[in-house]
Amino acid sequence: MLLAIDCGNTNTLFAIHDGNDWVAQWRSGTDSTRTADEHAVWLSQLMGLQGRSFADITACVISTVVPQALFNLRNLSRRYFKAEPVIVGEPGVRMDIEVRLDRPQDAGADRLVNALGARAVYDGALIIIDSGTATTFDVIAADGAFEGGIIAPGINLSMQALHGAAAKLPRVAIAKPARVMGKDTVSAMQSGVFWGYIDLIDGLVQRLKSEYAQPMTVVATGGVVSLFDGASKAIDHYDADLTIRGLLEVWKLNGGADT
């Protein structure tokens, strides 16, 4: 079985693929100081609840936007799975995607992995929205090349900034308000962040489509993207497994077959 690890700024996703489908997924808060042994204790307990063990894992693929976390994740794979991990972005790791940026090295590992995951399922030109610590909009050409995109603050980051910078504004949960106009501080903050982000998404997608001047499919993924379901007019597909599907594609491109 393949263990795919997607290490983001806020959360790290561990997912197991049995050769046919994803059979387990777990999230933990990203902590670059967590040792390989600490990862192993946590992961072994969760796998044990499903009747699985480390002996089931024969391969590992890792993508991280937190360089400090890589050392311990690599050691987790080496020490406990006896597998040399495929690590996105390292020399010699194939991605098979043309990057049409002025500085191709600026393309983040997570964004390229998302592009591969989307290309495996969707045809034609694409806009991929990934809502995490940052909200990214990535344009994938009809020929599969990474054209560029937009990086905006994430919805959680915006809510935290309101609370942190304004002394009288409380910490509130992100939620879809029943109405746009708030009747108290909490609902006003929720409305500003939620509907502000919906208009950010819909407005930027419209601008990208106008600039690109051809039909495009819009795919959304990320930890909070389910909140937008039914609210955004621009999103065509919500795809929770987009990133780990991309990691599976990376594994296949680099010799992976029987997981």
Curated annotation (Swiss-Prot):
Give an example GO biological process: coenzyme A biosynthetic process
Binding sites annotated in the UniProt record for substrate: 108-111, 185
Indicate the quaternary assembly: Homodimer.
The EC number(s) attached to this protein equal 2.7.1.33
Protein's name in the database? Type III pantothenate kinase
| Cofactor remark | A monovalent cation. Ammonium or potassium.
Q: Which UniProt keywords apply?
A: ATP-binding, Coenzyme A biosynthesis, Cytoplasm, Kinase, Metal-binding, Nucleotide-binding, Potassium, Transferase
- Give binding positions for K(+): 130
What is the protein's known function?
Catalyzes the phosphorylation of pantothenate (Pan), the first step in CoA biosynthesis.
Could you say which cofactors this protein requires?
A: NH4(+); K(+)
Per UniProt, where does ATP bind? 6-13, 133
In which compartments does the protein localize?
Answer: Cytoplasm
One term under GO cellular component: cytoplasm
Signal peptide annotation? none
